[in-house]
Amino acid sequence: MSGVNNTSANELSTTMSNSNSAVGAPSVKTEHGDSKNSLNLDANEPPIDLPQKPLSAYTTVAILCLMIAFGGFIFGWDTGTISGFVNLSDFIRRFGQKNDKGTYYLSKVRMGLIVSIFNIGCAIGGIVLSKVGDIYGRRIGLITVTAIYVVGILIQITSINKWYQYFIGRIISGLGVGGIAVLSPMLISEVAPKHIRGTLVQLYQLMGTMGIFLGYCTNYGTKNYHNATQWRVGLGLCFAWATFMVSGMMFVPESPRYLIEVGKDEEAKRSLSKSNKVSVDDPALLVEYDTIKAGIELEKLAGNASWSELLSTKTKVFQRVLMGVMIQSLQQLTGDNYFFYYGTTIFKSVGLKDSFQTSIIIGVVNFFSSFIAVYTIERFGRRTCLLWGAASMLCCFAVFASVGVTKLWPQGSSHQDITSQGAGNCMIVFTMFFIFSFATTWAGGCYVIVSETFPLRVKSRGMAIATAANWMWGFLISFFTPFITGAINFYYGYVFLGCLVFAYFYVFFFVPETKGLTLEEVNTMWLEGVPAWKSASWVPPERRTADYDADAIDHDNRPIYKRFFSS
């Protein structure tokens, strides 16, 4: 989509939605060349493309994206520390209640609110604060939301014995993390070379798992103290993480798409040059620049974006919003936060004396599995990873729930004190299998897909809505889990199993493959209405050669079982 013509934006969208629109596409005059077909070059001459280089050539951009992805560490750190805070004696004494025996405890309501209200803050922050990135740029946006996060941490760490002060602090820090969760993957997706975009966006999840792991380790290291050191060390380190995040923003390039949108074309070229390790005058870079600029100019024809545009079905934006909301919701409904938020509590119930150690093991498996995900997301594609991930996780939950129900809860709530080391060990093993499956597929894959899906004019809004759905389900799961497990205990696992079955079929029918495509090509694929299960075979119009069969994606002769277990 490297140009615009004199038709309206809606007319052009309709033209492009025809799957055979490669012929007769609009022509344009680009900034660096003569008039040419915007959707298809000469059938016998492949377009100039930025070359795929050895991974070693992308070291610089990988480091820069790692700095941006550090926002994931901040979120992971909160997840890892809060799961232990609610089991630390000083935290319970300060923010809990006394029972008739004079013992302090955290009620299910208070525990649920303290843990889960953070997600509400994140949902609001993602929707409201992501707009800062559209107005002032992604980098300034990330600095701003990180500053808001620091304010929330300051309120929490100064709490003495008022649980509602700590509660308010978590809401405010959640506002900041919600903004980070939208802007960080967004900026990475916009500066990363298309050949490794999925890998670099996956770094956000990798940093998140590192934060969870180190948060677990910090709780384990401070649990033997008998004062506020138990939990204030974990909170105090948040200031260091925020400082690192802000400092990193001084070195990373601004989004070339944002720069073009605000008329800073030369800066945009320098950003592309820095990301792709080529000269500013490289012909392939200039073609990439023209493609991005033309796509932005096309979007500008429709005027300023509004929230109501998210409901547009003609431009397939509503379909993308729905897909983003569903995929982010289903990520929570895999049941991952059942273990991450309440892992320490869960493994107490299976008879472990030091359940903090098991949480550290979860953190280790989660962290190192994420390194595998950095490779698999680009090697096998987004859809294949999600399909195999859902299938493997539902198998893990089937074993986890069945062992828990039959060995540790055979008589229901009337026998809650049953423990079994064998059953407990089995459940821990399959928990680790689950964490491995989640970390290598759904954990980062959802953020990759959502960051690649929306056209630039509504990208921040679309990503904010999709991410807000993730936070809202995170709130519901983290708040109601203590009540649900109190009523049905390990039967809860069957609920997540059912959600994973649904997730598998949803991905197969509604989530397209975006591996190897530029963001503009992803937009074209959506406009052409390519069925998700055929998207892996789709070729962008400008890359189609004379022997390309436009009807090929309409026919799939593979056996049904092969269709369901591949992209």
From Swiss-Prot:
Region: Disordered, residue numbers: 1-45
Q: Which gene encodes it?
A: HXT11
Residues in the Extracellular compartment per record:
78-112, 161-170, 219-232, 354-359, 406-429, 489
Keyword Metal-binding applies: no
Principal subcellular localization: membrane
Protein name in UniProt: Hexose transporter HXT11
Any Pfam family hit = Sugar_tr
The family database entries (InterPro entries) matched by this protein are listed as: MFS_dom (IPR020846), MFS_sugar_transport-like (IPR005828), MFS_Sugar_Transporters (IPR050360), MFS_trans_sf (IPR036259), Sugar/inositol_transpt (IPR003663), Sugar_transporter_CS (IPR005829)
Q: What does this protein do?
A: Probable glucose transporter.
Family note: Belongs to the major facilitator superfamily. Sugar transporter (TC 2.A.1.1) family.
Subcellular location as annotated:
Membrane
SUPFAM superfamilies given in the database record = MFS general substrate transporter (SSF103473)
**Biased composition regions of type Polar residues, renumbered to the chain:** 1-22
Keywords in UniProt for this one?
Glycoprotein, Membrane, Repeat, Sugar transport, Transmembrane, Transmembrane helix, Transport
Q: Which residues lie on this side of the membrane: Cytoplasmic?
A: 1-56, 134-139, 192-197, 254-336, 378-384, 451-467, 511-567
Please give the biological process terms from Gene Ontology that the record holds.
carbohydrate transport; hexose transmembrane transport; xylitol transmembrane transport
Can you tell me where the transmembrane regions are? 57-77, 113-133, 140-160, 171-191, 198-218, 233-253, 337-353, 360-377, 385-405, 430-450, 468-488, 490-510
**What's in the GO CC field?**
cell periphery; plasma membrane
Record's bilayer topology term? Multi-pass membrane protein
GO MF assignments: carbohydrate:proton symporter activity; D-glucose transmembrane transporter activity; fructose transmembrane transporter activity; galactose transmembrane transporter activity; mannose transmembrane transporter activity
- According to the record, glycans are attached at N87, N227
